[in-house]
Amino acid sequence: MTHYHNPLNGRKVLNQQFVLQAPFLPCGDQPEAIRQLSRGILDGIPSQVLLGTTGSGKTFTMANVIANVNVPTLVLAHNKTLAAQLYQEFKAFFPENAVEYFISYYDYYQPEAYIARSDTYIEKSLLINDEIDKLRLSATRSILERRDTLIVSSISCIYGIGSPDNYSSMALILEVGKEYPRSQLSAQLVRMHYQASASPQRSAFRERGSVIDIFLAYESDLAVRLEFVNDTLVSIEYTDPLTMIPSHTVPSVTLYPGSHYVTPEAVREQAIRTIREELEQRLLFFEGRPVEQERLFQRTTHDIEMIKEIGFCKGIENYSRHFTGAAPGEPPTCLLDYFPEDFLLIIDESHQTLPQLRAMYRGDQSRKQSLVEYGFRLPSAFDNRPLTYEEARRYFRRVVYVSATPGELEVQESRGHIIEQIIRPTGIPDPLPEIRPATGQIDDLLEEIRQRLRKDQEKILVVSVTKKLAEDIAAFLAELGIAAAYLHSGIETAERTQILTDLRLGTIDVLIGVNLLREGIDLPEVSLVAILDADKEGFLRSSASLIQFCGRAARNVHGKVIFYADRITPSMDHMLKETERRRQIQLDYNKKHNITPKPIIKPILANPITKEGAQEDSRPETQSTEDLESSIKQYEEAMYKAAQDFQFDEAAKYRDLMNAAKRQLLFKQGEDGNSK
């Protein structure tokens, strides 16, 4: 297995400190949790659990532990929504450090597949999000360059990317005073996946007389300007990528590739040889099956020619083990391989994230089986895959599992090293659920909703057992003039994002769904959580899920939870006992310290586009995904036109508007909850 390597000519990785900045100090259970977790990591305890209730400040505790331990850190979240939220929070806690974001960069992804029964081949189709691609490259650049790096990632971190050895060996180190033949330098930039372009754009370079401007693949706010006298490099400046106004001068610079899949020429030649060898063996296997034999020969030889000519081909990831030198069946290289041996792994919402880690491999292998069996791909395609859970566990050398309801697996792995964080800084205790009959539950719920709506700014979450029931209840409430909406996996990303925004802004008062846990809904405005048919045992009626649902009302001083059930199931019984235990701990603490429960003030996330910019563009502050994509395209065109006309102030304005729209689009797309 490939592990951390820094082959940048022996250059030292920057050993900066994590500097935590926060307007408050640890309180309640936080100081002891921080002390125990930090000491456990430094003492070599491989696995610990932070059992923290909703609203107890687990993220702040994690930030303090990271600052204390001071090693590169990976925070793993189970979906894009939570990854985005954690990224924003950690950026605020560590503004001087490298806080990065690594999720799947596909806006749309249809994997390659073959359906044998209908003889249907589905070609891979995808749309890559340029902004996320930049953030992914920024993440790997940071972890190779500096130890004060914190990467927040989705499950995407266990999927194969190019090896850190190949990636970093293609980095280009330039120093003032040295000679670099211009033609060779340009050719090297092309091999690094930078393209020659007259316009300023990411992953491109522009030659003008004695100057080469490089627009970095992993940075949108800075470009690099190289100035030469003949072939001697006399100046390196960081500049604004549009105005090219210098920011600061440096004696040297390291330029990283524009793709994780770049490879040195020697590696590429070796890969071509081993691909041909595998092809020859597979053609013998298909002896007597001319259709599969011809198909595989044509497809693979075409790919080989593309790799020879341009160093890349469509679907090159299917040949990944040939480029990394791995043996068949060996784990692929992934983001985890970019980290040093002593890195800290924090698995957030571990009760959901660990089952995901287990599931990723099986789904990937079943799809590729028919592609290999019918000659669309070589068997080495099987090795372009996510890690198995057992392979991923090899990286669990220093891990903290974080959850309000840790699963059996985390508890076993931690071997008793479970640190509780029950006390909420707000003083709000867990609401003790009321059990009411399931018979007549809708009428009873309606009365509860009406009582809540008489109060200002209070919201209601309703958990149903089926999508159809969620839709029916929303329609029923709407007929009665109640602002209600349903939310489930059948809702498109853009619409789901808008529903969540409307709930926060007050346009919607009641939200009905099947699995509202996955949406990351944690709002102080929610004062009532109602679980319909709570006695129907299943995944979303397990004791862990029921405790999580209760936590959704624990941020409001008037929080109330109602379980509609005709019997108390074992899951409900466990939930009631655990909730009472946690509630009593909080009440005792409040009494001892004379604390009065108070609500938290959680600001509504504003549109990142400035008011001035929004007014000039005459668009509403809350835009749909389609509107944002259209805005980005318009701003980009206007930016390039202004730059070409040397109207740099105007170009910078459109650049800022475009980047703000990209950030908002990234946040919206994160709301889809896709695991990668």
UniProtKB/Swiss-Prot annotation:
One of its GO terms (biological process) is nucleotide-excision repair. The keyword Oxidoreductase does not apply. HAMAP family: UvrB. Keywords: ATP-binding, Cytoplasm, DNA damage, DNA excision, DNA repair, Excision nuclease, Nucleotide-binding, SOS response. Residues 629-664 form the UVR domain. It holds the Pfam family Helicase_C. Belongs to the UvrB family. Residues 441-604 form the Helicase C-terminal domain. Residues 611-631 are annotated as: Disordered. GO terms for molecular function: ATP binding; ATP hydrolysis activity; DNA binding; excinuclease ABC activity. GO terms for cellular component: cytoplasm; excinuclease repair complex. ATP binds at G52, T53, T54, G55, S56, G57, K58, T59. This is UvrABC system protein B. SMART domains: DEXDc, HELICc.
